[in-house]
A protein has these predicted regions:
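Short loop/turn elements that flank and shape the SAM/SAH-binding pocket of Class I
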Residues: 150-153
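Rossmann-like AdoMet
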Residues: 2-100, 104-147
Length: 153
């Protein structure tokens, strides 16, 4: 995936990019995002995830580890294909479904299935949702919940 040429601002951030603090957030959520974006930009992609491409272009983040890990990238794409098919099939049969995507990270499946569900809830840890909310402004039928699925409350 090509990186845009940009300049640094006074804060040491790339102009036009958003730097995210990964403190307390699993970096794998950005690596999986990058894998989907990189696949989408191939000449003959196995999946299409325009939201991932849009977010990666806005991020000031070093994706060199994700670029080197072909096995991880291929696994992400295989998992995306399988889960998109399973979710799509279910939603085709249950158009009034309410979906809860637990440990969503930067998953964008809700956008790839827009119009095929009644409501969609993306749930993850507060630290993760803080990053997600900077790039995905979800409202209407898509909601974000910052909580642990392990909490009893």
């Amino acid at each position: 995936m090509e990186q845009e040429k940009t300049t640094m601002n006074q804060n040491g951030e790339l102009e036009g990019k958003t730097r995210v603090s990964m403190e307390g957030v699993p970096e794998t959520m950005l690596q999986t995002l990058y894998a989907r974006a990189a696949e989408t930009e191939k000449e003959k992609p196995a999946i299409r995830d325009e939201k991932a491409v849009e977010i990666v272009k806005r991020l000031d983040y070093d994706f060199s580890l994700a670029k080197k890990d072909a096995a991880m990238g291929n696994g992400v794409i295989a998992r995306t294909i399988v889960l998109d098919k399973l979710v799509g099939n279910y939603l085709n049969e249950h158009s009034n479904a309410v979906v809860v995507n637990i440990a969503c990270g930067m998953d964008t499946r809700c956008y790839r299935n827009e119009g095929h569900y009644k409501r969609w809830y993306n749930l993850d840890l507060p630290e993760t949702m803080e990053v997600r909310q900077r790039f995905l402004k979800e409202d209407g039928v898509i909601s974000q919940i910052a909580a642990s699925a392990m909490d009893a409350d």
